[in-house]
From Swiss-Prot:
Protein name, as recorded: Putative protein adenylyltransferase MJ1215
SUPFAM superfamilies, alphabetized: Nucleotidyltransferase
Highest taxon of source: Archaea
A Pfam family reported for this protein in Swiss-Prot or TrEMBL: NTP_transf_2
One function term, GO molecular function aspect: metal ion binding
Quaternary structure (record): Probably forms a complex with cognate toxin MJ1216.
Cofactor binding, note field: Binds 2 Mg(2+) ions.
Binding site for Mg(2+) 1: 47, 49, 79
Length: 86
């Protein structure tokens, strides 16, 4: 799954390019990156921590489909949480 380690700017650009799909297919209202990538401390082995807020709360299947979708477009292991879970 891993390629060259992406910068935070590259990750944000990828997410921007997929904004329409994220909103239409997964009802994503907002996305925030936190953890090592947000602090600029990521390593080759780091996953990316993403917090998502939804327009409509998804069922578990749709939530994990979103996590898989993000991993595929970013080519990085994603640790996904919801805004309501913190």
């Amino acid at each position: 799954m891993r390629g060259r380690m992406k910068t935070l700017s590259e990750i944000k650009e990828i997410l921007r390019k997929h904004k329409k799909e994220l909103k239409e297919n997964y009802k994503v209202k907002s996305i925030a990156i936190f953890g090592s990538y947000a602090r600029g401390e990521q390593k080759e082995t780091s996953d990316i921590d993403i917090m998502v807020e939804f327009y409509e709360t998804p069922d578990y299947l749709k939530f994990f489909e979103l996590e898989d979708y993000l991993e595929n477009i970013l080519n990085i292991k994603v640790d996904l949480i919801t805004k309501n879970s913190i």
